[in-house]
């Protein structure tokens, strides 16, 4: 059990998770060392609305001045992270919640001044993750990072990809609420970066699946070797630890 697996669960999925999801995490933990990264977009947007703070997005990223960053930190590192940890432990999965600023876990480079406190992962302190795992805990990471003693928001997909690449993880698993992509009436089980562009052009990949495959492509560029996009509301893990869903790698032909 030397291989690492990183599981990314978006904020919109957190309220949909059922017993099946936690059973799958247990199966993964029997075969691999598991790290979980979560988002929190819907809860952040709701809290910003409650605070009467307007939200602007550019290229899919939330513009994050200081007042927005304070809310993002409060939600991700507070309620969202702790509720997820408690849910895992309710299902007998020992977990420790932390953010990327704890122990300088996730160090970032700012994306741009125009977008505010938004960063991209530049360094991962893997010793902290390995230490928690060696004590039989599942690290549950809120995607917040640090740069020059300031706290930055990180897109959860890229945070998960950065962690997976730093750990040389066997696989990054992206949790969704759909089974995958249908091509000519069949579920696509394997694809690669070049064929994803073809499938988008043909209209096979549409709607909400487009950002998911784009996240997979970005992960490949960061050095992750294998990304699985799975339906977290169903059994997505074999007893062997293999995922049931769509796998994105390099050089696999399906079209």
Swiss-Prot record:
Biological process (GO), any one: L-arginine biosynthetic process
Listed EC numbers: 2.7.2.8
Keywords linked to the UniProt accession: Amino-acid biosynthesis, Arginine biosynthesis, ATP-binding, Cytoplasm, Kinase, Nucleotide-binding, Transferase
Reactions that this protein is recorded to catalyse: N-acetyl-L-glutamate + ATP = N-acetyl-L-glutamyl 5-phosphate + ADP
Family the UniProt entry places it in: Belongs to the acetylglutamate kinase family. ArgB subfamily.
NCBIfam families according to UniProt: argB
Protein name, UniProt field: Acetylglutamate kinase
Gene, per the UniProt record: argB
């Amino acid at each position: 059990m030397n291989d690492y697996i990183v599981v990314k669960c978006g904020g919109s999925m957190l309220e949909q998770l059922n017993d099946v999801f936690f059973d799958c995490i247990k199966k993964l933990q029997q075969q691999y060392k598991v790290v979980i990264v979560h988002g929190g977009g819907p809860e952040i947007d709701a809290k910003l609305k409650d605070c009467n703070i307007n939200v602007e997005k550019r290229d899919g990223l939330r513009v994050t001045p200081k007042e927005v960053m304070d809310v993002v930190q409060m939600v991700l590192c507070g309620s969202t992270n702790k509720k997820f940890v408690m849910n895992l432990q309710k299902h007998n999965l020992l977990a420790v919640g932390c953010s990327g600023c704890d122990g300088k876990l996730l160090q970032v480079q700012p994306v741009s001044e125009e977008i505010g406190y938004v960063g991209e992962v530049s360094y991962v302190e893997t010793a902290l993750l390995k230490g928690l795992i060696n004590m039989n805990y599942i690290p549950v990471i809120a995607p917040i990072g640090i740069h020059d003693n300031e706290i930055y928001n990180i897109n959860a997909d890229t945070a998960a990809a950065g962690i997976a690449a730093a750990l040389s993880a066997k696989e990054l698993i992206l949790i969704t609420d759909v089974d995958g992509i249908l091509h000519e009436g069949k579920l696509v089980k394997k694809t690669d970066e070049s064929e994803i562009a073809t499938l988008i052009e043909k209209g096979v990949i549409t709607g909400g699946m487009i950002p998911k495959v784009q996240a997979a492509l970005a992960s490949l560029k960061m050095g992750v070797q294998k990304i699985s996009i799975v339906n977290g509301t169903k059994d997505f893990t074999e007893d062997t630890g293999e995922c049931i869903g769509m796998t994105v790698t390099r050089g696999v032909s399906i079209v």
